[in-house]
From Swiss-Prot:
Name of protein: UPF0122 protein Sca_0859
Superkingdom of the source species: Bacteria
UniProt similarity note: Belongs to the UPF0122 family.
Main function: Might take part in the signal recognition particle (SRP) pathway. This is inferred from the conservation of its genetic proximity to ftsY/ffh. May be a regulatory protein.
SUPFAM superfamilies named among the record's database cross-references: Sigma3 and sigma4 domains of RNA polymerase sigma factors
Alphabetical list of InterPro entries matching this protein: RNA_pol_sigma_r3/r4-like, UPF0122, UPF0122_fam_protein, WH-like_DNA-bd_sf
Matching HAMAP family: UPF0122
Family matches, as Pfam families: UPF0122
Length: 110
């Protein structure tokens, strides 16, 4: 698995966590098997008795859909921003002014 594949898989795992409630059962099943459980397209096709191409198309469309949700709702992006601010806060624990600034940044995200 290349670094780009790993980054995409990690991103899709996060997007799945944030947006799975907005997906159909079939979409959830396909994404979960492909990205979380590392099933191949053929294994998923055999499991659901459909063609490999049907699985590929569904995963691609569903991936596009969760990316669209992220563009509109920005749940993952804001999660990443909050995580970075928390890390900065931990590093600045002795600086009250910096902590106040980070708290204000967190408030702006909400």
């Amino acid at each position: 698995m290349s670094k780009n594949d790993l980054v995409k898989t990690l991103r899709m795992n996060y997007l799945f966590d944030f947006y799975q409630a907005l997906l159909t059962k079939k979409q959830r099943n396909y994404l979960e098997l492909f990205y979380l459980q590392d099933y191949s397209l053929s294994e998923i096709a055999d499991t659901f008795d459909v063609s490999r191409q049907a699985v590929y198309d569904n995963i691609r469309r569903t991936g596009d859909l969760v990316e669209d949700y992220e563009t509109k709702l920005e749940l993952y992006s804001k999660f990443e921003q909050r995580r970075e601010i928390y890390n900065q806060m931990k590093a600045s624990i002795e600086d009250p002014d910096a902590l106040k600034r980070y708290i204000e940044e967190l408030e702006e995200l909400e």
